Each structure stands twice: as C-alpha cells, then as structure tokens.
Design a protein with these regions (language model features):
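NTP-dependent nucleotidyl-transfer catalytic core
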Residues: 1-203
C-alpha cells in the first residue's frame, strides 16, 4: 500500500548525556513514542531516533569539573601516551553531581567558564585524553538512559548523537563562509537566521 512505502523518521528523545532526565524529556518521550506507534499502526515504516546531546558545553563542564575533583587522573596528563583505562573513573550518580556543580560555578566564575569552553573546544578537536573521557561519559550515561527509557516503555531504533555530525561541520562552515551566509561578529562566526535583517556588510 501507499502507506507502507512511506518512511517516517521521528526524533523524540533529546536527552543530554551527563545530565539527568527531567519532566521535559518525559513529555517528548511519551508523545514521540505515541506518534511512532500510531504511525506503525497506520502502516508507515517508523524509525525512532533518540538524538543525544553529547557534543556541547556540558561536556567541557564535566571534564573541567572532573579535573578539579581528580586532577591526577591520567586523562589530564599532557605527556601520557599509553592506553587509557577501560573503566570510567566515575559512576552515573557522581556524573550527575559533577555537571550541576560545574555549571553553577561557571555562571559565577568567568575564568572557570572559559576553562570549560576551552575543554569543549579541545574535545571537539580530538584531544586523546578528553576523547577517552567522552567515551566513558557516553558509556555510563547511555546505560542509564536505556534503563530509564525502558521503565517508560519507550524504545529507539537509532541512538544518533550530536557528535555524529562533526565530520560534516568543517565543509559546511566553509560553504557558508564562501556563500556569504556566515560572518564574524565579536570574534564569533555568525549566521543570521532572520532574513529581514541585513548583514553588517550591507549597512
């Protein structure tokens, strides 16, 4: 039938790793799961995607917060060239404590926030120690998220992440610059989304 030939991809997770789920995630998960089931009942091929937030400032905050608590961990040794531990240096309970503490401190301490921003940048540039920590954060968080979603009877076909888009970003940024969509403003590369607002170049 025509309905069975239609593919629907539904993003209804939106959880952030290293952070606990809250009531907003409950709403989107239940509504999304309902839409997916209704679509399947109607004959559509539905694909559920959790779409994890794993590549933003919260990662830099966790890394900075962990370094403040355990500065002697091998992940922070600039001269270390060996294999990193397979077991995470934190539990999910500790991880969920690190983030809010680091986030709160970053709002009061500009230097601390800048350290977290730099840690985020270094992670996104592939710094080995930070990538190893990111893998630990992902493993611990996803295990806990799957347990929580299972308790809600919510399931996903795909566990895609923000970081999955990283390989495409450099070319996309260059294309936006080449085509005049992106411009620098106060040291940041900006894309104006309001088409009625002229670019600074036009003023």
């Amino acid at each position: 039938s025509a309905a069975s030939d239609v593919y629907k991809r539904q993003d209804y997770g939106g959880a952030n790793v290293a952070k606990p789920l809250h009531v907003g995630h409950l709403r989107s998960a239940v509504i999304g799961e309902s839409i997916k089931r209704i679509g399947k009942f109607m004959g559509h091929h539905m694909i559920g995607d959790v779409h994890l937030g794993d590549w933003g400032l919260q990662m830099g905050l966790v890394i900075t917060g962990l370094q403040e608590r355990q500065p002697d961990l091998v992940y922070f040794d600039e001269n270390y060239t060996g294999e990193y531990p397979e077991e995470a240096p934190f539990t999910i309970s500790e991880l969920e404590e690190i983030y809010p503490c680091a986030s709160g401190k970053s709002k009061e301490d500009e230097e601390y926030r800048n350290e977290a921003l730099e840690a985020t940048h270094q992670l996104q540039q592939g710094k080995p120690g930070y990538m190893a920590l990111w893998n630990h954060i992902m493993q611990v968080s996803v295990t806990d998220l799957k347990r929580n979603y299972a308790n809600l009877n919510v399931s996903f076909d795909l566990w895609k992440k923000e970081s999955d888009a990283q390989p495409y970003i450099p070319d996309m940024v260059q294309k936006m610059k080449d085509q005049g969509f992106a411009y620098e403003d106060q040291g940041a590369l900006v894309v104006c989304l309001l088409y009625t607002s002229p670019s600074p170049r036009d003023s």
